[in-house]
């Protein structure tokens, strides 16, 4: 289930809750790149926001 989406230019990240775990799914140019598990929803949102705002993450 997608909880939130972060977008900036050609990058986006979805914060999801899958099987009780929070996961951030990273996209660039609408193509899936990678994902990362987080301990809390807030941590997942912070990771997602960092990804879309900073070019050097991942």
Regions found by a protein language model. Give the residues of each.
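Short, mixed charged/polar active-site loops
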Residues: 12, 32-33
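Short beta-strand segments
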Residues: 4, 33-34
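Short N-terminal "domain-start" leader segments
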Residues: 1-25
């Amino acid at each position: 289930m997608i909880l939130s989406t972060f977008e900036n230019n050609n990058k986006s990240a979805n914060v999801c809750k899958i099987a009780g775990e929070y996961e951030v799914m990273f996209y660039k140019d609408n193509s899936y790149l990678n994902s990362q598990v987080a301990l809390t929803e807030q941590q997942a949102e912070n990771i997602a926001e960092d990804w879309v705002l900073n070019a050097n993450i991942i």
